[in-house]
């Protein structure tokens, strides 16, 4: 697994550091004294907050600039008082936002360095983004070095939870993949399950599903639950029969992450193999509140609809908990209008990223206000980022809670088919991340009916592990199993050889005694025979 922790800066970035250090005398440490803070607070109005947004220009991403920019501007109007008439910052405070194409790669880092170099060492006050893991890692390291607060609705992989050193200035305003893993753990505890197979798409590029199930695996591993895994590339021809065979050879509880069409294909293949009658439990993770990923929708208007409806009776979908409030409806309409003006027409105008970056502005402003009141300045990035941690505030879609490590708690729902005749689905359970509590909703029909799910976790299985589920530098489970089985077989063979040799030795000794008693008789008979022959001769 390519590790985020070993991503390195290029030589040009190191040179940029050296040049900028000469220009600015190095970055702040976040520990500026109150005296300096008071002086800057006195000169606060009028001032501007410079924000650098690093997101891809490519609209194939759910978090492209065209999709997220309307949400950021909506939030800025709110905090500047233009929308509500209530200002959250001192009069005269204005935001100056620069939008740069991250290209979901090294361009994000280069954009940051080039911008600072062009401004003769002047750094932005806030970084929003990037989202993609491989783009976010070097930017987060540089933000920590330069004492810049960095808020993102991305960088969701497990590696970013290590905030003690290189990611110390990162706050994640969307639930990380590990939070999804905590939800799955609570679900498994509820059902008293301990084993699962992870089936996911991995294109070796953005690797969203890989990082998602890596988070699930790490949480399960810490708690002693067993996982095996199977991955495939959706950009190539899929062998659905092969995927189903791997599931049959592994576990009865299946956690999947792939596009909605691929999920449908897997469920159809599983149904044809008789795997949707209660002996298997299928879970699909709908990433980012986007219907691109399997959202539980079985209907396509084709000849397979009836069969798909039957298959989906065994499928449950994990999605972010959705809340509805009047302000959110207004926000959604404005975002939709702005996005459509960009020439984009789709169902998912407001996904997890759009919500997250809106809430990132609110969170930053709340933290900045507290830092300014304490006598520090907008340049005290370490102080600001600490104020964004371990707090709860009201976001655009409901309450947002950030834990003590700067990661947002995740609230999730489980959606299942409750009417197999009509094929309708509804939420049957919810997980509340801050409390770590999973609850089934009352008065809903359980998807399998009473005691219909028959999962035998004691059976022997074959494991195909090709995933995030192996620890670097260690033996895979299959290797350990092979060693143990080989040792047992070897010991059995040695014991069998010992007893066989002992019995064989006793038999030989008995035969030798009998032969010694008869050897004289045989010799006499042979000699008599020889003599008789010679006599005949």
Swiss-Prot record:
One term under GO cellular component: plasma membrane
Pfam family example for this protein? ANF_receptor
The residue ranges for the Extracellular side of the membrane come to 42-477
> Tell me, which GO biological process terms does this entry list?
osteoclast proliferation; positive regulation of urine volume; regulation of blood pressure; regulation of osteoblast proliferation; signal transduction; skeletal system development
Its recorded name reads: Atrial natriuretic peptide receptor 3
Q: Origin organism of this chain?
A: Bos taurus
Glycosylated residues: list them.
82, 289, 390
Record bears the keyword Signal: yes
Describe its partners and assembly state: Homodimer; disulfide-linked. Interacts with OSTN.
- Molecular function per GO: natriuretic peptide receptor activity; peptide hormone binding
Indicate the transmembrane segments per the record. Answer: 478-500
Spell out the Gene3D superfamilies in the cross-references.
Answer: 3.40.50.2300
- Identify its protein family: Belongs to the ANF receptor family.
Disulfide pairings: 104-132, 209-257
Report residue numbers covered by any propeptide. Answer: 21-41
**Role description:** Receptor for the natriuretic peptide hormones, binding with similar affinities atrial natriuretic peptide NPPA/ANP, brain natriuretic peptide NPPB/BNP, and C-type natriuretic peptide NPPC/CNP. May function as a clearance receptor for NPPA, NPPB and NPPC, regulating their local concentrations and effects. Acts as a regulator of osteoblast differentiation and bone growth by binding to its ligand osteocrin, thereby preventing binding between NPR3/NPR-C and natriuretic peptides, leading to increase cGMP production.
Q: Other remarks?
A: Has low affinity for peptide hormones in the absence of bound chloride.
Where does the secretion signal sit in this chain?
A: 1-20
Q: Which SUPFAM superfamilies match?
A: Periplasmic binding protein-like I (SSF53822)
């Amino acid at each position: 697994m390519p590790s985020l922790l070993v991503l390195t800066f290029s030589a040009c970035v190191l040179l940029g550091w050296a040049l900028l250090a000469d220009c600015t005398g190095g970055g702040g440490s976040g520990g500026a004294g109150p005296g300096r803070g008071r002086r800057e607070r006195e000169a606060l109005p009028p001032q501007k907050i410079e924000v650098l947004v690093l997101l891809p220009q490519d609209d194939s991403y759910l978090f492209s600039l065209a999709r997220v920019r309307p949400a950021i501007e909506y939030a800025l109007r709110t905090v500047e008082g233009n929308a509500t008439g209530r200002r959250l910052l001192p009069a005269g405070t204005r935001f100056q936002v620069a939008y740069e194409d991250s290209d979901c790669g090294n361009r994000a880092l280069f954009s940051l360095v080039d911008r600072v170099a062009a401004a003769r060492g002047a750094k932005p006050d806030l970084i929003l983004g990037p989202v993609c893991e491989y783009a976010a890692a070097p930017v987060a390291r540089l933000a920590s070095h330069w004492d810049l607060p960095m808020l993102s609705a991305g960088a969701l992989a497990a590696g970013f939870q290590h905030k003690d050193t290189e990611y110390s200035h990162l706050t994640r305003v969307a639930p990380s993949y590990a939070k999804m893993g905590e939800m799955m753990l609570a679900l498994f505890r509820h059902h008293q399950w301990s084993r699962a197979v992870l089936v996911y798409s991995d294109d070796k590029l953005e690797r969203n599903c890989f990082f998602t199930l890596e988070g699930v695996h790490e949480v399960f591993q810490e708690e002693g639950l067993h996982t095996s895994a199977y991955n495939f590339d959706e950009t190539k021809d899929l062998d659905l029969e092969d995927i189903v065979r791997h599931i049959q050879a592994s576990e009865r509880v299946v956690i999947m992450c792939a596009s909605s069409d691929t999920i449908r294909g897997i469920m159809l293949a599983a149904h044809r193999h008789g795997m949707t009658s209660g002996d298997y439990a299928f879970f699909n993770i709908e990433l980012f509140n986007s219907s691109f990923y399997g959202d539980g929708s079985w209907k396509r208007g084709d000849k397979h609809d009836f069969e798909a409806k039957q298959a989906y009776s065994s499928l449950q979908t994990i999605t972010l908990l959705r809340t509805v409030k009047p302000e959110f409806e207004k926000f959604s309409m404005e975002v939709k209008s702005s996005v459509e003006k960009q020439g984009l027409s789709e169902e998912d105008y407001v996904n997890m990223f759009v919500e997250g970056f809106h809430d990132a502005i609110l969170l930053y402003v709340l933290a900045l206000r507290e830092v300014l009141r304490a006598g520090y300045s907008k340049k005290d990035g370490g102080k600001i980022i600490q104020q964004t941690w371990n707090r709860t505030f009201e976001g655009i879609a409901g309450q947002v809670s950030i834990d003590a490590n700067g990661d947002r708690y995740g609230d999730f729902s489980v959606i299942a088919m409750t009417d197999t005749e009509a094929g309708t689905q509804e939420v049957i359970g919810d997980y509340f991340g801050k409390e770590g509590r999973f609850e089934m909703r009352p008065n809903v029909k359980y998807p399998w009916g009473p005691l219909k799910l028959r999962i035998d976790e004691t059976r022997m299985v074959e494991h195909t592990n090709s995933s995030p589920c192996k620890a670097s530098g260690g033996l895979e489970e299959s290797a350990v199993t092979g060693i143990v089985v080989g040792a047992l077989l070897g010991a059995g063979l040695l014991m069998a050889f010992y007893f066989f040799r002992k019995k064989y030795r006793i038999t030989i000794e008995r035969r030798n005694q009998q032969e010694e008693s008869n050897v004289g008789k045989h010799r006499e008979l042979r000699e008599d025979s020889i003599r008789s022959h010679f006599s005949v001769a």
